[in-house]
Swiss-Prot record:
Name of this chain's protein: Gag-Pol polyprotein
The encoding gene: gag-pol
InterPro entries: Aspartic_peptidase_AS (IPR001969), DNA/RNA_pol_sf (IPR043502), Gag_p24_C (IPR045345), Integrase-like_N (IPR017856), Integrase_C_dom_sf_retrovir (IPR036862), Integrase_C_retrovir (IPR001037), Integrase_cat-core (IPR001584), Integrase_Zn-bd_dom_N (IPR003308)
Species in which this protein is naturally found: Simian immunodeficiency virus agm.vervet (isolate AGM155)
Positions of the catalytic residues: D536
Location of the Integrase catalytic domain: 1227-1377
Length: 1470
């Protein structure tokens, strides 16, 4: 058999020859395969005898397994053969090669892992350096075989920790997918879900992964349907989609599917594939940059470009072939021109190593210097050969710029290309990897001395900041240069102060600014001769044309290299050169140079420095536009005095030098008036620009910060620092496309010349977009800084920053300085004089300490005469103080302002107001202080009744006051204290949500029985939180009781009043069941007053208990609300009478229906006053309401009933009487705006959409609250109604991809609000409530919830009138749509008509006049307008022609007053 065949005995050989090469194949293994395997062992350094034993086969597998995935076909065949031999040695029955491979993978689970498990700790670390440990840290992860069972091995904490750290550091970058693949190798779905569950802070990304899992699971269920019928006993079921995801399967089932099922289903690998699809989608969302957009910058190193390119490639969701094609084509195609030339020279398909080696240093200074040197050397050698200058001089050997050796050039250097850091100059790393100090604003001395760090003295616009030391270096800026030079500031780190005597001339010298948009040429005096020369920091020597300068004295011949080759020059030593105001001495070269050059030998002596600033160009620019159809301001500059013109010229000159303004010419068609006022110190002027016209035309902005932060909402900190951003607006650049609209003109005195025109380059003061853009930009900058400085708590309002921390003093100061440095890097200066480091800190009108806060001092002044303006300021002070001083009142002081309009009107004080003023003055004498918020402690709000309709409340934590406030708002003329108390609670709740984000526990001065008695009938409050009822006097009580049932045994008073609308005369009276009656004549009254007078008369003449029947809905509505105070004297008298009664029954009956005593009293008081009209169809209206529960407006319009009758029909309904009808307000909404929300009715989910402007609703029951169902419902709305804007909350179904895709497809703008925020989703929340109320009324009439929802929609849309126009919601919606169409059609017709001109004749005058503007065209005549006069001309005397006059463009206008006046006039007429 031979040596190789001895690997198997005869029995084993028989088994070996029965094993097939492939499943279901014909060929089987033969002896020749063993002989071939023995010959191949030498290739891998293995002995053929290893095939004879089980251990030997395992060693062979250990060597071949790493090579098998990427090996050749022969190597894979050898690996398969060894696996078959191993199974034969282990006496395991296998049918084919695939079964043998599966057994080897399952049982052995890679031999190298067994070695890892038995290797000692010292060797383990050594061996693991080259391989990746298993996720579980076990050799048999994820399972171990114990007998015939498989036991799960959980993931190790080390693996989970590595996964969490990877996600936190990479933030779902492209590296996450391979990291997950490596860590989840061999995991079960249970293990993978454990890896996902530890990512608690990335719910958005996990939701995306979850959606992918659901889609893939559903697809799996479709392609793998379960078998019909029950499974045989003991048979393992097939996994479904949810089983693979691990939601409906156990770990043991997952192991059985992977290892013992027939056929086996690797659910772990399938689930990994689904997760990888989701992660790839997350990577794409978190890395939106496409590989097509990755291009190499002009000076970007090729290595950095390659890093960015492959990072984008890894984030692309594409196949391997597509990525390979992208790499081969785009990597070279998107390189910069320098690298592209080199890469194309490498031939087809170069390797990445070859490309990186070839493009080292391309674009850097060393590369450019090498190219320049080689070019100059070639040119110089040619020139010297032509001139004969090279005779007798041996040519030096070439020197390599890469290795520094002689004998070869850099391009021939065999050594790798060396790289140097552009920051520190050291080799071995690039600038981006440099660990040295990153100075964003550096000054490089020309003479090569050590660089010093300078602070920026200018922000984006050039605003100066105070230096950190007292040592200042003088600046003399050039008139033509921008602010690019800064004062030097000595740094505390790695530097020491030198005495003045040791300072070099450079350090204490001055230097000037030079613009770089043209050549920096200066006139200097050399040897007494004035010469214009170029200041060149790149030139070593100073060289002057021989035609411009002749020097006396000795000289030496010299050849210097230039761009054009070598030059023969004369070298003069010790030549005096005067540059600016400095006298310098040095070497000057005279020769045939193309241009005079002052080199570094003189510039260094002059103290010249290159100042390179990291200005605010990194700040993102916010795009701004005008409103649709609006144009920029074109206002004439009004006259200014001479001193103001001079002041404006000086201010603008400074701003222009600092880069905040730019000059513009007459081609800019826009202008805004400018003026100036004196500052408070009267020594300086302040420039003001009247941007009112521009503000009208500018797009609307949303104030990103709705209010100022309150100290009570801040957490207590050990250390506090207050920082102010200097010249905040001037630090932020303005959109370049919008700058033209900010143009203004500085006139000249007596119009001696054209005015100087400027435009703003930064955010201007007074423009409405400046606050929003600054807040938004500064917020984004602070977000980046907060990620770095997590120890600091930063609170921002505009340019004021509150910075707190729990660190010690020195550490806190260091963090604050780091914060200031980061802001400075972004161009936001924080002047030292505005930094507050010691308490008390003055911030936003408060005084702050680390443990408490106070208000800044408030003093109430005493004046002889008070004007309206003075009182307004006084009320403002008291309202500001009311947030910390309890008990302050302003009601009587505010009454003094009623009816006053002029700010300078003198106000007379009332005794009540003076008493209130003195009381407030005493309260303010006692200083109050507040504490800071502690999140772990409960928040409580205590309310006190002050009397006179005013209330006070305090927010507390464990007895310490956080904040106080007052409430005195009264919406209605007649009200009671319980209604006001509900308003107080609402205000407190909203204030707590804004400041702390949570509702407090309320302590209210009311008894529970009193509140519940009133609340049972009170329906106008839509939101009342939970509270504690505290018996603290003075209590809120109900002063009288209205019974709901008639009082037996008491007389019934039928009351009524009547009034004549013309004469204003009327009668009021009553008649009782016992025949008692009384009528009173009234003068100058109304129907309502007469009705109330009648009730007052009945109360006066009745006993302690009384039954009163009225037909006045007005009086009924007032008295059933149980008011305790009123601005009406008559109602106050009625309240006083009702308080004295023990019990009162008040009932309403419809008028003029012949009802007993009501008809009699009606006739009695109406005699001679009004006409009585009895009404029918009430029964029909009641039947209609019983069926549809229509509101009173629909009943009044449909059946012709008075409002009071229709309202009473609704009030008498037992289902509609509980809470009445909601009070409708006005909603400012566009016709295309809808709101959508989900609510729950009877345990089912109902999705509701409301058209905000009309109140029309669409609703239906959906099976699940998912994005898919929501998108389906939205598609129905889009298909039925015109919708342009959808507003929802930020629930997961509304923020899902399905809804986003549907909004994109339907061109619907989607915005979200915050749940439970009083300012969000007001319309839809109200409609949800109304829909539930309607369903509650009709629920007994229908069987299913779905039917009830649709019936309720019909009733709401078609059976209830009211609101805008008194229409139903459906009528209102259709009316709005048709109105919009009509308006658009009419505007089109008007625009077409206005395009025509009319020539006409008048009377007998044969001369044609015109052209006039056509206003209207009829059948027999036309209406036209000429000048200001409208004329009607017969059709036969008019000729209508189209206006073909060419339109003037913006540049055609003359920008002079009066130019284009006719056009402006016509525009105004239209």
């Amino acid at each position: 058999m031979g040596a190789a065949t001895s690997a198997l005995n005869r029995r084993q050989l028989d088994e070996f020859e029965h094993i097939r090469l492939r499943p279901n194949g014909k060929k089987k293994y033969q002896i020749k395969h063993l002989i071939w395997a023995g010959k191949k062992m030498d290739r891998f350094g293995l002995h053929e005898k290893l095939l004879e034993t089980e251990e030997g086969c395992k060693k062979i597998i250990e060597v071949l397994s790493p090579l098998e995935p990427t090996g050749s076909e022969g190597m894979k065949s050898l690996y398969n053969l060894v696996c078959v031999l191993l199974c034969v040695h282990q006496e395991k029955k296998v049918k084919d090669t695939e079964e043998a491979l599966a057994i080897v993978r399952q049982c052995c689970h890679l031999v190298d892992k067994e070695k890892t498990a038995v290797t000692p700790p010292g060797g383990q670390q050594k061996n693991n350096t080259g391989g990746t440990a298993t996720p579980g840290g076990s050799q048999n992860f994820p399972a171990q075989q114990q007998g015939n069972a498989w036991v799960h091995v959980p993931l190790s904490p080390r693996t989970l920790n590595a996964w969490v750290k990877a996600v936190e550091e990479k933030k779902f970058g492209a590296e996450i997918v391979p990291m997950f693949q490596a860590l989840s190798e061999g995991c079960t779905p249970y293990d993978i879900n454990q890896m996902l569950n530890v990512l608690g802070d990335h719910q958005g990304a996990l939701q995306i992964v979850k959606e992918i899992i659901n889609e893939e699971a559903a697809q799996w269920d479709v392609t793998h349907p379960p078998p019909a019928g029950p499974l045989p006993a003991g048979q393992l079921r097939d996994p479904g989609g949810s089983d693979i995801a691990g939601t409906t399967s156990t770990v043991q089932e997952q192991l059985e599917w992977i290892y013992t099922a027939n056929p086996r289903v690797d659910v772990g690998a399938i689930y990994r594939r689904w997760i990888i699809l989701g992660l790839q989608k997350c990577v794409k969302m978190y890395n939106p940059v496409s590989v097509l957009d990755i291009r190499q910058g002009p000076k970007e190193p090729f290595k950095d470009y390659v890093d960015r390119f492959y990072k984008a490639i890894r984030a692309e969701q594409a196949s391997g072939e597509v990525k390979q094609w992208m790499t081969e084509s785009l990597l070279i195609q998107n390189a910069n021109p320098d690298c592209k030339v080199i890469l194309k020279g490498l031939g087809m398909h170069p390797t990445l190593e070859e490309m990186l080696t070839a493009c080292q240093g391309v674009g850097g200074p060393s590369y450019k210097a090498k190219v320049m040197a080689e070019m100059m050397q070639n040119l110089q050698s040619q020139n010297m050969v032509q001139q004969g200058g090279g005779r007798g001089r041996p040519r030096p050997p070439p020197k390599c710029y890469n290795c520094g050796k002689f004998g070869h050039m850099q391009r021939q250097c065999p050594e790798p290309r060396k790289i140097k850091c552009l920051k520190c100059g050291k080799p071995g790393h690039l600038a981006k990897d440099c660990r040295g100090q990153v100075n964003f604003f550096r000054v490089w001395p020309v003479d090569g001395d050590k660089t010093k760090k300078f602070s920026r003295s200018h922000s984006w616009g050039g605003t100066k900041c105070a230096p950190s030391t007292e040592q200042l270096y003088t600046l003399r800026p050039s008139k033509e240069a921008p602010a690019a030079v800064c004062r030097e500031r000595e740094t505390n780190e790695k530097s020491e102060q030198k005495p003045p005597s040791e300072q070099s001339r450079l350090e204490r010298g001055i230097f000037f600014e030079l613009p770089l948009w043209r050549r920096p040429i200066r006139t200097c005096i050399i040897g007494g001769t004035a010469v214009k020369a170029l200041l060149d920091t790149g030139a070593d020597d100073t060289i002057i044309k021989d035609t411009d300068l002749q020097l006396r004295g000795s000289w030496r011949p010299k050849i210097v290299g230039g761009i054009g080759g070598g030059l023969n020059v004369k070298e003069y030593d010790n030549v005096e050169v005067q540059l600016e105001d400095k006298i310098l001495r040095g070497t000057v070269l005279i020769g045939a140079t193309p241009i005079n050059i002052i080199g570094r030998n003189f510039l260094a002596q002059a103290g010249a420095k290159l100042v390179m600033g990291q200005l605010s160009q990194t700040i993102p620019i916010t795009p701004v536009r005008l409103k649709e159809g609006a144009r920029g301001p074109r206002l004439k500059q009004w006259p200014l005095s001479k001193e103001k013109i001079i002041a404006l010229q000086e201010i603008c000159k400074t701003l222009e030098e600092e880069g905040k303004l730019s000059r513009v010419g007459g081609d800019n068609a826009y202008n805004t008036p400018v003026f100036c006022i004196r500052k408070k110190d009267k020594s300086q002027w302040r420039m003001l620009v009247d941007f009112r016209e521009l503000n009208k035309a500018t797009q609307d902005f949303f104030e990103v910060q709705l209010g100022i932060p309150h100290p009570a909402g801040l957490k207590k900190m050990k250390q506090i620092t207050i920082i102010d951003v200097g010249d905040a607006y001037y630090s932020i650049p303005l959109d370049p496309e919008f700058r033209k609209y900010t143009a203004f003109t500085i006139p000249t005195v007596n119009n001696e010349g054209p005015g100087i025109r400027y435009q703003f380059n930064c955010l201007p003061q007074g423009w409405k977009g400046s606050p929003t853009i600054f807040q938004n930009t500064a917020s984004k900058i602070l977000e980046e800084i907060k990620k770095e400085l997590k120890q600091l708590t930063i609170v921002q309002y505009m340019d004021d920053l509150w910075v707190g921390s729990q660190e010690e003093g020195p550490k806190h100061d260091q963090l604050v300085q780091t914060l200031r440095n980061r802001l400075q890097e972004w161009g936001l200066e924080t002047p030292e004089k505005k930094v507050q480091r010691e308490p008390p800190f003055e911030w936003m009108g408060y005084k702050l300490w680390p443990h408490k806060w106070k208000l800044q001092s408030i003093e109430l002044e005493k004046k002889e005469q008070w004007t309206v303006n003075d009182l307004q300021k006084l009320v403002g002070k008291l309202n500001w103080a009311a947030q910390l001083y309890p008990g302050l009142r302003t009601k009587n002081i505010c009454k003094l302002l009623r009816g006053k309009k002029n700010l300078l009107d003198v106000v007379e004080w009332t005794p009540e107001a003076e008493a209130e003023y003195e009381e407030n003055k005493e309260i303010l004498k006692t200083e109050q202080e507040g504490t800071y918020y502690a999140p772990e402690k409960p928040l409580r709000a205590a309310v006190q009744k002050l009397g006179d309709g005013q209330w006070s409340y305090q927010f507390k934590q464990e007895g310490k006051i956080l904040k106080v406030g007052k409430f005195a708002k009264q919406k209605a003329t007649h009200t009671n204290e319980l209604r006001v108390l509900a308003g107080v609670v609402q205000k407190i709740g909203k204030e707590a949500l804004v400041i702390w984000g949570q509702l407090p526990t309320f302590e209210l001065p009311v008894e529970r029985d009193t509140w519940e008695q009133w609340w049972a009938d009170y329906w106008q409050v839509s939101w009342i939180p939970e509270w504690d009822f505290v018996s603290v006097p003075p209590l809120v009580t109900l002063w009288y009781t209205l019974t709901k049932e008639p009082i037996p045994g008491e007389d019934v008073y039928y009351v009524d009043g009547a009034c004549n609308r013309q004469s204003k005369e009327g009668k009021a009276g009553y008649i009782t069941q016992q025949g008692k009656q009384r009528v009173q004549q009234l003068e100058n009254t109304t129907n309502q007053q007469a009705e109330l007078t009648a009730i007052k008369m009945a109360l006066e003449d009745s006993g302690p208990k009384v039954n009163i029947v009225t037909d006045s809905q007005y009086a009924m509505g007032i008295l059933t609300a149980q008011p305790t105070q009123s601005d009406s004297p008559l109602v106050e008298q009625i309240i006083a009478q009702m308080v004295q009664k023990e019990a009162i029954y008040l009932q309403w009956v419809p008028a003029h229906k012949g009802i007993g005593g009501n008809e009699e009293i009606d006739k009695l008081v109406s005699k001679g006053v009004r006409r009585i009209l009895f009404i029918g169809r009430i029964e029909e209206a009641q039947e209609e309401h019983d069926r549809y529960h229509s509101n009173w407006r629909n009943l009044a319009d449909t059946f012709g009933l008075p409002q009071i009758v229709a309202k009473e029909i609704v009030a008498m309904c037992p289902k509609c009487q509980v809470k009445g009808e909601p009070i409708h307000g006005q909603v400012d909404a566009s016709p295309g705006v809808w709101q959508m929300d989900c609510t729950h009715i009877e345990g089912k989910i109902v999705i509701v959409a409301v058209h905000v402007a009309s109140g029309f609703i669409e609703a239906e029951v959906i099976p699940r609250e998912t994005g898919k169902e929501t998108a389906k419902f939205l598609l129905k709305i889009i298909g039925r109604w015109p919708i342009t804007h959808l507003h929802t909350d930020n629930g997961p179904n509304f923020t899902s991809q399905e809804v986003a895709a549907m909004c994109w497809w339907g061109k619907v703008e989607h915005t979200t609000g915050v749940p439970y925020n009083p300012q969000s989703q007001g319309s839809i929340e109200s409609m949800n409530k109304q829909l539930k109320e309607i369903i509650g009324k009709i629920r007994d009439d229908c069987q299913y919830t779905e039917t009830a929802v649709l019936m309720a929609c019909h009733i709401h849309n078609f059976k209830r009138k009211g609101g805008i126009g008194g229409l139903t919601a459906a009528e209102r919606l259709i009316n709005m749509i048709t109105t919009q169409l009509e308006i658009n059609t009419l505007q089109t017709k008007i625009q077409k008509i206005l395009n025509f001109r009319v020539y006409y004749r008048e009377g007998r005058d044969p001369v044609w006049k015109g052209p006039a503007r056509l206003i209207w065209k009829g059948e027999g005549a036309v209406v036209l307008k000429e000048g200001e006069e409208l004329k009607v001309v017969p059709r036969r005397k008019a000729k209508i022609i189209k206006d073909y006059e060419p339109r003037k463009t913006l540049g055609d206008e003359t920008h002079l007053e009066g130019a284009g006046g006719s056009d402006h006039q016509m525009a105004g007429d239209s």
